[in-house]
């Protein structure tokens, strides 16, 4: 928030939903109700138990296999713990109980355990790109652009859901471009539902992303929302657009594999500059309409 104030913005913490025990703290700069373009990123940090969160947006069979492998690994660990306790106590009941609670503990640790100290791509990169975009906007474009930093994305996009519930017009009508894991990889996947694609604001965003791609050393791939696997805050908005970066891997296709581990230490400055320039250009095009 201090950085936003240095740039002349007036950020504030959006009103928390007192009925929600997680007490989301979404940070907002600008006027989302009257803006033509919303740009967002999540600022909460994922918990980690050392298992990578493989993001595979376009290869559904491999995506399912990767998720199944994680679950199988957790089941095996839980079974080993349960078996050890069962053998030590010579109790089948304790074996079953220990297995169940060990699996439950692993699930909870994945969501609410120790925060990952290495989060360069997820999602420091998204925040950095958003802040750089804020810096580049002209005074006129600032009037038509708003920014939201969502809380609790890692626990099921709860912050974005809460914000949408309290601001229904924004949730249903406004184009929102969400930057998540945009630092590691040179291929950008942009996912947008039909309602977003029909908006002139989306046309400006897409045009700017395509215009700046080659000079920035990146490529872009555009899909409908149904054509991309994975969660994200943008899915909580009717006209939400997801933007993420990926690598190409033989036999898998697009993939990002370091997040939620100690190896999440990579962010290409070229990616941040590319997104900031493209989104600033798009905002200026909207202002010139």
Predicted regions and their residues:
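Conserved beta-strand scaffold positions in the cores of enzyme catalytic domains, especially
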Residues: 11, 147, 176, 240-242
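A non-catalytic alpha/beta surface segment that caps or lines the substrate-entry region
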Residues: 1-34, 50-86
